């Protein structure tokens, strides 16, 4: 049987005699474990076998963090960590790390808490099914990329050092500690979302 999934609802508070809407009010309702503190018992019974399997995976501890890692511009521990992971993951494609790792701040949806790191916490930080993409770019294109990052007041990066003014102007940049050469080819490890031209 078919059904509906409501992703957005509004309540018509005011109508005319002909039922024409003249006023609408709305508010955000976060659908999470706090909102659903008292789930339907029958539904919970049906879902339990699947929930148990998912929980077993999500609660698996895969590492530890000695500190809270937050996200934010111009850079942060978490954004730099994720960019560094992408840079190192390029070994699978290149046989060596990429010259640069890049992730957008908007793609990071949570912080990494101090203590044990679970699979579920990684999914909360990176909830989208993004794939690793390794791009090869000329130095001239890299400079345009760096200017774009500067105009956003920073993104998650690794393998490079940038100096950005408070106004979002690129002041200086190096790749692997070296100046950017216009005709040289560089590799950038990022996510498919950005590689496809999305993001700000």
Predicted regions and their residues:
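Feature captures C-terminal
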Residues: 12-32, 80-91, 95-200
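Second-shell loop/turn segments in exported
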Residues: 66-76, 130-133
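Short amphipathic
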Residues: 59-65, 134-136
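Start-of-domain marker
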Residues: 18-52
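Electropositive phosphate-/nucleotide-binding environments in soluble metabolic enzymes
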Residues: 37-40, 44, 76, 80-84, ...
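Sec-dependent N-terminal signal peptides
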Residues: 1-2
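C-terminal motif of bacterial Sec signal peptides marking the signal peptidase cleavage site
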Residues: 5-8
């Amino acid at each position: 049987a078919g059904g509906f999934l409501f992703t957005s609802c509004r309540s018509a508070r005011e109508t005319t005699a002909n039922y024409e809407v003249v006023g609408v009010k709305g508010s955000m309702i976060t659908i999470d474990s706090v909102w659903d503190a008292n789930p339907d018992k029958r539904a919970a019974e049906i879902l339990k076998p699947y929930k148990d399997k998912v929980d077993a995976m999500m609660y698996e501890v895969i590492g530890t963090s000695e500190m809270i890692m937050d996200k934010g511009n111009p850079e942060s521990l978490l954004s730099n960590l994720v960019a560094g992971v992408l840079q190192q993951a390029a070994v699978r494609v290149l046989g060596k790390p990429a010259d640069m790792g890049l992730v957008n701040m908007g793609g990071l949806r949570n912080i990494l808490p101090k203590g044990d790191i679970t699979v579920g916490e990684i999914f909360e930080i990176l909830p989208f099914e993004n794939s690793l993409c390794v791009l090869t770019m000329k130095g001239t294109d890299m400079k345009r990329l760096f200017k774009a990052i500067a105009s956003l007041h920073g993104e998650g990066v690794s393998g490079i050092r940038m100096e950005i003014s408070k106004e979002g102007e690129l002041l200086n940049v190096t790749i692997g500690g070296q100046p950017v050469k216009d005709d040289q080819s560089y590799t950038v490890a990022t996510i498919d979302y950005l590689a496809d031209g999305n993001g700000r």
